[in-house]
Amino acid sequence: MDPRIREHAETIATHSTGIEAGDTVVVQLPPAAEDLAVALHEICGDRGAQPVFLSYSQRADRAYKRAADSFEEPAHRRALYEETDVFVIARGGANVTEGADVAPETNAAYNRAIEAVKRERLSKRWCLTQYPTPGHAQLAGMSTEAYEDFVWDAVSIDWETQGAFQAQLVEILDDAEEVRIRSGDETDLTMSIAGNTAENDTGEANLPGGEVFTAPVRESVSGVVHFDLPLYRYGREIDGVRLRFEDGRVVSHAADRNEELLTGILETDEGSRYLGELGIGMNRAIDRFTYNMLFDEKMGDTVHMAVGSAYPETVGETNAVNESAEHVDMIVDMSEDSVIEVDGEVVQRDGTFVFEDGFEAA
């Protein structure tokens, strides 16, 4: 076994989830990630935790969605989740476009059926990570070996140092009222974050981490945004997304590629037309775009926003939590002709923060 796999497992178990004696641990991994499953099970055994292994197959998931006429909440899965302390989930499918021929309305119906079960999982200790596979390497335009280096380097940085760097932005956002994002001629978006909390992502729920994220006040988002980096969702690429918000809600949308898939996402439920997250990428160690949101949203010089559900921990007691069966992140490249303003003050210009060397106020 590659020693980096054991290091990855140790980071998940110790830093990300804190697995300890008596914990029940669900390990959900694709077949390609068996070595990571083995390493995690060894750690569980050493610590006196009880693991349950779930194998995730994209082909099986596709087959079920295409064959079913309707979906119901999986009560057996909910029962398992209620008895679970820790979830470890790794991506790493052989074919990243496996679900491309599942209809958008089918995905929406399935997501609505499992929404409550997903919320149960999110209420526990959990970590979503990546296992490097040839399929993801191909999507990133990299050799398998180079992609393995990329992934294992990204998950093994000094998270204490990274967290201290990000804490400078958390301090700025914590007492802030309003954020404005401007980029080029097509993005000018304003939102209130008053009363909400900025979270410092240091590789716990997401590994790798490397962002600061919060939630907009639900009805406050106003303006237009052009997400100029593409994303993969349900096995298909969505590119050139443009959204217009009024009173927090998406009132018009367009995409250069797979607009009908974007439409299906926005029509999932009432909450899927509202923003649930504003995230600011701060991980300078992730220095290339790979068509994998787990990494891409953490890149420095980027901002991402998610239509759909908000993370409850980011929403203050006096504000409403946006609820949705969807949570779809999309990215704006902030490296050129771009600013982030907080309460009227520029805190980032062209990807450089006010607390970094090289920042130019104007």
Annotate each language-model stretch with its function:
Residues 1-222:
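Active-site bordering "gate/hinge" segments
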